[in-house]
């Protein structure tokens, strides 16, 4: 049976914390920031913990990564 590949898009959007929670980050901070206020850019830098109901689906996408 072939190896299960990691969903590379998942590894860029989501990470698993040391306690096993799934953390995501807000979009819209990478480029074209000149028109945005500093508060908006700083607010997008913070990650947030996803709801528990989403964890199993997200971890399945990261399965091949060994997390």
UniProtKB/Swiss-Prot annotation:
NCBIfam families the UniProt entry points to: rpmI_bact
Protein's name in the database: Large ribosomal subunit protein bL35
Molecular function as annotated in GO: structural constituent of ribosome
Keyword Lipoprotein set for record: no
Protein family membership: Belongs to the bacterial ribosomal protein bL35 family.
GO cellular component, one term: ribosome
InterPro entries membership: Ribosomal_bL35, Ribosomal_bL35-like, Ribosomal_bL35_sf
Single GO biological process annotation from the record: translation
Keywords from the UniProt entry: Ribonucleoprotein, Ribosomal protein
